[in-house]
């Protein structure tokens, strides 16, 4: 294998690696967006849950059944 052939091979590999790195970066960016949306949704659900517990009391505070 000549030096020129080795250089071409290395440059080809580098081009494929650059493409792979860009594709992986795109996936990471999209996952970060999804995580951010999920965190916002979770915060909203926690807020709603706390409001409901405040309105109706927690499960431990249930009144006894009517037959008591």
Curated annotation (Swiss-Prot):
Domain of life, per lineage: Bacteria
PANTHER family in UniProt: PROTEIN SLYX
Similarity comment: Belongs to the SlyX family.
UniProt-recorded name of the protein: Protein SlyX homolog
């Amino acid at each position: 294998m000549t030096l020129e052939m080795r250089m071409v091979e290395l440059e080809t590999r580098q081009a494929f690696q650059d493409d792979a790195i860009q594709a992986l970066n795109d996936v990471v960016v999209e996952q970060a967006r999804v995580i951010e949306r999920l965190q916002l949704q979770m915060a909203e659900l926690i807020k709603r849950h706390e409001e409901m517990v405040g309105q109706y009391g927690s499960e431990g505070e249930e009144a006894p059944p009517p037959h008591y």
